[in-house]
Amino acid sequence: MNMLSCDTSHVKSLNVQGLTKLNTLSCGNNELESLDLSGLSALTGVDCQNNKLKILNLVGTTMLTAVYATKNELESLDLKDCVELAELYCNSNKLTALDVKTATKLKVFDCSSNNLSQDAFKKLFESLPQREVGDNATCLIYTEETGVAEGNYKTFTEDELKVAKDKNWKVYKNSASHVQEAL
């Protein structure tokens, strides 16, 4: 089996252990509280948005290039084995820290609407991989949209953003009018 799709199926649990040839998993819009993808070394993409995930186990997912984990209840996310990761959408969770240092191919991520403090952002920016100007690497770090809970630190100084910008990352926020604005 190369692909498994069970979106919007009212699924409360999903066992994918042993599906060693699985490339793509799409299980968004369900009621999952945990998802164990450990050891799925052929997995390149996972879409688990709009669940109730408190645990997303990515240990051994060394080929994973894209993670869509928006709108869950994740408090932590271990990406240490995600060495091929290029896209990460973990916005609208409860993350208090995010370390992407092993994701050396990362070019796009959204971590808005979490619980990332000033210190957590300092560590996150330090962990960002160096990019080339032509990579157009972007990160969306907070939102000002009406009706969206934002727990992230928002009052960045130029010096705080300089670490990311010096690595050729474009840093954005979502404005109240739903437009991405450069910081």
Regions found by a protein language model. Give the residues of each.
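Ser/Thr- (and often Asn-) enriched beta-sheet segments in non-cytosolic proteins
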Residues: 13, 34, 54-57, 96, ...
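Acidic, glycine-rich calcium-binding repeat modules characteristic of RTX/beta-roll
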Residues: 88-91, 95-113, 119-120
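N-terminal capping/linker segments that flank leucine-rich repeat
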Residues: 1-20, 41, 62, 104, ...
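Consensus "Asn ladder" position of solenoid repeat domains
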Residues: 9, 30, 51, 72, ...
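Conserved hydrophobic position(s) of the canonical leucine-rich repeat
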Residues: 1, 11, 22, 32, ...
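Canonical leucine-rich repeat
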Residues: 14-16, 35-37, 56-58, 77-79, ...
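Conserved hydrophobic beta-strand positions in leucine-rich repeat
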Residues: 1-6, 23-27, 44-48, 56, ...
